[in-house]
From Swiss-Prot:
InterPro entries: Cyclin-like_dom (IPR013763), Cyclin-like_sf (IPR036915), TFIIB (IPR000812), TFIIB_arc (IPR023484), TFIIB_CS (IPR023486), TFIIB_cyclin (IPR013150), Znf_TFIIB (IPR013137)
Alphabetical UniProt keywords: Metal-binding, Repeat, Transcription, Transcription regulation, Zinc, Zinc-finger
Domain of life (superkingdom): Archaea
Per-repeat ranges for Sequence: 156-239, 250-331
Alphabetical list of PANTHER family matching this protein: TRANSCRIPTION INITIATION FACTOR IIB, TRANSCRIPTION INITIATION FACTOR IIB-RELATED
Entry's Gene Ontology cellular component terms: transcription preinitiation complex
Gene3D superfamilies: 1.10.472.170, Cyclin-like (1.10.472.10)
Protein name per Swiss-Prot or TrEMBL: Transcription initiation factor IIB
Length: 339
């Protein structure tokens, strides 16, 4: 068997030139910044960012030009398969993943509250007293100083608001990252923890295209709408958060679901809003009012009409707003609606 020697020069020539952009902790304008160091692969041939990880062929490939960026890719996932959450929990041999929604990122340990041994048997009274003391000191150790206590309180408040609003996990992670960024830059001083947490959650909702209005967040938080809006503008400026105006289309699925409207109405409303956007009818107008008017028009056209009062209650706007937006959309888009 012939073995060829490989020099350092040959190794350098064979290396793939992959541009890696690592997100800096102070750059919070990118909506995909979830981890402290997140890698982004860019094709060295065409410059595309559309990169596919093909684990079957063990390759990283550019979707646009087909250039193979890396070979012999290792799959770092588990070797077992699970088809539901119960199987996944049963077969997993590691703890929970790291998360930014816990003040210590979920890396510390917790002593179980059940007074049982590894065989499931009850432990003695002496052991129970010892475990009680250990649990007490464990709680104290996890939160060592005032800054950690404040962070733990803020993240619990953030999680409480998110639970009330039914927000998904990625929104909570984004909000936690934004709040930690505000703490690192000293933006909390002189402001309430609840206000900054609510503002971070509002920014995360807009970033993840899961829109919630300031009124909705203020209703479940301990601060008013005015303070949340003022704090949101402040942290957006200081953290360099650039967010596009909220698209009315993003509100349609939620409003249609709450009104129990069929999918045809939702699709029709989205079509109306897309045409309105092309003609500039959504600029300078509240996205919730425009979305509510489009849903009202679509429900009438599809024969599943909802009253203006019903739509207004769900969207959090007045009936006058719906009528004004309704007139604009029907006149400029030549929609014939028979009431």
């Amino acid at each position: 068997m012939k073995v060829e020697s490989v020099t350092k020069e040959d190794t350098k020539k064979s290396e793939r030139k992959i541009k890696i952009a690592i997100a800096k902790p102070e750059d919070y304008s990118n909506k995909n910044v979830i981890l402290e160091k997140e890698e982004e692969l860019i094709c060295p041939v065409c410059g595309s960012k559309s990169i596919i990880k093909d684990y079957e062929r063990a390759e990283i490939v550019c979707e646009m030009c087909g250039c193979v960026l890396q070979q012999n890719l290792f799959d770092v996932g588990p070797e077992w398969r699970a088809f539901d959450h119960e199987q996944r929990v049963k077969r997993s041999r590691v703890g929970a993943p790291m998360t930014y929604t816990i003040h210590d990122k979920g890396l510390s340990t917790v002593i179980d509250w059940r007074n049982k041994d590894s065989y499931g048997k009850d432990i003695s009274a002496d052991k129970r007293a010892q475990l009680y003391r250990l649990r007490k000191w464990q709680r104290r150790i996890r939160v060592s100083d005032a800054s950690e206590r404040n962070l733990a309180f803020a993240l619990s408040e953030l999680d409480r608001i998110a639970s009330k609003l039914g927000l998904p996990r990625n929104v909570r992670e984004n909000a936690a990252v934004l709040y930690r960024g505000a703490v690192e830059k000293g933006l909390i001083r002189g402001r309430s923890i609840e206000g900054v947490a609510a503002a971070a959650l509002y920014a995360a909702c807009r970033r993840c295209k899961v829109p919630r209005t300031l009124d909705e967040i203020a209703e479940v938080s301990r601060v008013d709408r005015k303070e949340i809006g003022r704090t949101y503008r402040f942290i957006s400026r200081e953290l360099n958060i650039r967010l596009a105006p909220t698209n009315p289309v993003d509100y349609v699925p939620r409003f249609a679901s709450e009104l129990k409207l069929p999918g045809e109405v939702e699709s029709k409303a989205i079509s109306i809003l897309q045409k309105a956007g092309e003609r500039g009818l959504t600029s300078g107008r509240g996205p919730t009012g425009v979305a509510a008017a489009a849903i009202y028009i679509a429900s009438v056209l599809q024969g599943t009409r909802r009253t203006q009062r019903e739509v207004a209650d769900v969207a959090g706007v007045t009936e006058v707003t719906i009528r004004n937006r309704y007139k604009e959309l029907t006149e400029h888009l030549d929609i014939d609606v028979t009431l």
